[in-house]
Amino acid sequence: MKRNRITNVIIVVLVIAAVYQTGELWLEGTAGHNFFRAVKESISATDEASESDALLATRYAVGDGASNFSVYYPDKVGSSDMLEKANDVLQEILAENIGESTELEKADWKEMLQNKCIVMQYDFMINMDDYLEGMRSLKNGQDLDSFDYITIVPARRTGEESKAYFVNSQTNDCVVYRAMKSKSAPILFEALQAEPEGEMVYISTGQKTSSAVLRRNLFLPQWAELPYQYDTLRQVPAFEQDGAVSRVLLENTAERFFRNFSVDWSQRDENGNFVFSDSSVVLRYNPGSRMLEYYNYENYGSDGPKTALLDGYQISCNFMTNDASLQTDVYLADIGGSGNETVYYFDYAVNGLPVYLSESVQQEIGMKHAIEVTVSNNSVKKYRRYAVNYEASGAKDASLDVQFIDALDAANRLYQETVEQREIADVKNIALGYFADRTEGIRLQWFVNLYDRIFLIETDSTLPEQTAVTETEPETVVNASTNS
């Protein structure tokens, strides 16, 4: 950030004034609380990064070396046992490469995936230097600026070669780190077993196809027999019972965001929102939009260094464990922010598949993702969540009979009809997920990303074809530790 001292002072004064006005509006009627009381202690359980940063990933694929893959989302908030094992191996591989140079090369997915491996996939680009911030002495001979895949190929035994590939799927460039001394590699090797989810199996397009259109490696589900019967989802509001807000449920969650919680701090404002506050924290729940919002004003006006990428991720995940109402798995969907703030965006996942919020839901809640966590100065400054959970119906009440290749054909046809006549030269992504456009009977859809458009394709051929088209934002690189 390019600031001189005068500009810095002005900005701080303006921010404090804005915060004061906001605090007056939100805390009206709570005059017994001194808004600017200096509270130096922070809630350690919410703000500390863990001792061993787990490997962040949107999703990860496990390959058994025999062309069988399983795809998972984190089964704990922000991590999983498998990701923790993978992180141990990656740290050992990188540590062994300190002082060594790497060469930029083209990614060969067939070679990468022919052995047991774990592939971390991200739905956004990550700056290479930021990710390796803790290992500045690692050399990257011909710089790989950013990546969206990490593939770890562990050795069967200590003394054999383990590899870590960082891949940029846009350019197909990669760098490879090799190590012979990883003690954790054999543990990960034994744990890597692909376990298909019932009738659904995954293939790697990088290993199985040579199509010029599918240039990026994608892990896509397919079925030997169709139709495939599955459970729809229903939406469960986190703080409601019998159609009304439960104060008990709300207070049980609210108390975990405060050091010394008291129900005397709560009120309902003129808009019907439930507000809990003390001298530094405001927690608000809007029953109309079902938005839960947390603000910590201790961090406003601070101008410290930006929190490291992985530290901020762990701080976000640790903070979310304080939300007792969060009962659905979440995954990292994106990272953004500006100045010394980093924003981590999360979405829900059920039964190993993502839940995508419809555009109408996004407009209602004012967010593109289900959860936003803003980290500044190694603390959570803001937490916003669409406070619902999703659960399976348990009834096998929906049917799927459209494979991904058919969905791609349908999206291609829609592109020609609704956007422009153009030969599709690159498919950015194909994903299967639940489309949360209702509260009951939430079904699976194909989401096909062609250039700057996402097409929703029906998975049940007996239902009317979707014509929904969503414009996407240009893909940017996450730069989460360099001030600009």
Where are these regions (language model features)?
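Preferential activation on post-signal-peptide N-terminal prodomains/segments
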Residues: 11, 20-311, 319, 482
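Exposed beta-strand-loop-beta-strand "reactive/processing" segments of non-cytosolic proteins
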Residues: 250-296, 324-377, 427-457
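Secondary-structure junction/capping motif
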Residues: 53-54, 60-61, 308, 369, ...
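Extended hydrophobic
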Residues: 393-397, 404-407, 426-473, 477-479, ...
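A short, surface-exposed beta-strand/turn
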Residues: 175-194, 284-295, 357-383, 454-484
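N-terminal Sec-pathway targeting helices
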Residues: 1-15, 23-26
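Short helix-loop boundary/capping segments
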Residues: 374-406
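Short, non-transmembrane alpha-helical segments in secretory-pathway proteins
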Residues: 78, 82-103, 244-258, 300-341, ...
